[in-house]
Amino acid sequence: MSALLILALVGAAVAFPLEDDDKIVGGYTCPEHSVPYQVSLNSGYHFCGGSLINDQWVVSAAHCYKSRIQVRLGEHNINVLEGDEQFINAAKIIKHPNYSSWTLNNDIMLIKLSSPVKLNARVAPVALPSACAPAGTQCLISGWGNTLSNGVNNPDLLQCVDAPVLSQADCEAAYPGEITSSMICVGFLEGGKDSCQGDSGGPVVCNGQLQGIVSWGYGCALPDNPGVYTKVCNFVGWIQDTIAAN
């Protein structure tokens, strides 16, 4: 894993669709407020995504760490005040103790909000996994990441894409020696459809449960290069213990 790759994924993910298409490959603009757990991490600008897991905690990717973060909830168009947003500063930001910035193993981070959010139809938590998602499970990935294959176009409106969990064998074959037990691949081995990572730290939700966190990958929609995500089902104990201790 190169440092260049890691840097490329922070803030807005790399997008390299096979087709000359200025949209996330296979993706679409999410119906307004259909992803109420999606958050935007902001430090004067949107730089990563995350997921609300209860009224005072957000989960994201550890490689999205900044010492000061404002969490923005209830967003759809992140460049317009629409009246449903809640902006809350982070009180605590906790990276997994075994996170590796080189291999991106254990790429998970918890953010405690300085005050609880007001839960409603447009701001609501997503459930943690009760079990790991088997290969073939269909998932929803969302984010405000770059939508251009050449250049930069960060969309105003939240983007969604549907993609399946791949087998661990296929994931390891796609990235020999780079996949750990804390990573899963989601996407299509044949290429042509992908989330283009959406946004680093953002959610992969399967059957109503948070199964993945946008972590890394090589390009987008390239054959044999699916997106790689933090395997959230392996971290439920750590999440629960960390919340209880803080």
UniProtKB/Swiss-Prot annotation:
GO biological process, one term: digestion
Keywords: Calcium, Digestion, Disulfide bond, Hydrolase, Metal-binding, Protease, Secreted, Serine protease, Signal, Zymogen
Essential cofactor(s): Ca(2+)
GO molecular function: metal ion binding; serine-type endopeptidase activity
GO-annotated cellular components: extracellular space
Annotated catalysed reactions: Preferential cleavage: Arg-|-Xaa, Lys-|-Xaa
Enzyme class: hydrolase
Family to which this protein belongs: Belongs to the peptidase S1 family.
Quaternary data: Interacts with SERPINA1.
Protein name in UniProt: Serine protease 1
Organism field: Rattus norvegicus (Rat)
